[in-house]
């Protein structure tokens, strides 16, 4: 299923569910996705109470620990290529930046200016193993999942644009569809976009029958076993 097979409204419908629920729904619809395709490492979430975000990945790599070796003109050309890549392709987007330094996050590529620029270019959020800063001036509504918070930008600059990157254990290519919230991010197969809301509601229904017993008076192992037995008989 290509992007023409679903609408922006279909994508936005997925933001009604947190990322763990989307992961569960993916397992229901496509069991082969279980165990991979999501972030697996610790991160800092900028806005834990913000609703989930979804968008098409724009990828790049940065460095910040040492000065670059490109001429000023060549570095400016690479910067321009980077911004063009953010502005090219389907939107909304999520920006996925891999910091290649041995100590990722030595300098922050991201702050007040970059967050504002990327909102202007149609991005809804950021995943980076690098660092961010300027938290009080950060663009409203732009989520981030980052490796750390930093004070300085040091020598932060893009060193490559596009292709495959790895952030928090997740391999991402430009154009991948990502769902993210304070728990992390998961790649969403486009063919499953329209089916995911119903699958998510089915998962919630299954869990509610167990939670009703667990949270009710007189919960016992036998009551729980019977509830699980009922689910097994249905599903």
Where are these regions (language model features)?
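A short secondary-structure junction signal
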Residues: 72, 107-110, 129-130, 137-140, ...
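Extracellular/luminal Protease-associated
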Residues: 84-128
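Ligand/cofactor pocket segment of small-molecule handling proteins
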Residues: 115-136, 141-150
């Amino acid at each position: 299923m290509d992007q023409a097979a679903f609408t922006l409204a279909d994508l936005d419908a997925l933001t009604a569910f947190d990322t763990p629920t989307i992961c569960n729904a993916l397992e229901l619809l496509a069991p082969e996705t279980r165990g991979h395709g999501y972030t697996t490492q610790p991160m800092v979430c900028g806005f834990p109470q913000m609703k989930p975000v979804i968008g098409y990945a724009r990828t790049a790599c940065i460095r910040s620990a040492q000065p670059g070796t490109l001429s000023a003109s060549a570095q400016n050309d690479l910067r321009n290529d980077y911004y063009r890549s953010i502005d090219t392709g389907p939107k909304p987007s999520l920006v996925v930046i891999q910091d290649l330094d041995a100590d990722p996050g030595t300098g922050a590529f991201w702050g007040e200016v970059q967050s504002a620029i990327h909102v202007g270019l149609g991005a809804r959020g950021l995943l980076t193993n690098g660092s961010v800063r300027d938290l009080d001036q950060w663009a409203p509504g732009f989520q981030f999942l980052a490796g750390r918070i930093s004070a300085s930008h040091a020598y932060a600059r893009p060193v490559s644009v596009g292709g495959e990157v790895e952030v928090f254990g997740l391999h991402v290519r430009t154009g991948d569809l990502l769902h993210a919230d304070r728990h992390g991010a998961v790649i969403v197969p486009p063919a499953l976009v329209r089916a995911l809301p119903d699958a998510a509601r089915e998962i919630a229904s299954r869990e509610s029958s167990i939670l009703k017993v667990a949270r009710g008076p007189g919960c016992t192992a036998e009551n729980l076993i019977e509830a699980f037995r009922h689910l097994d008989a249905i599903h």
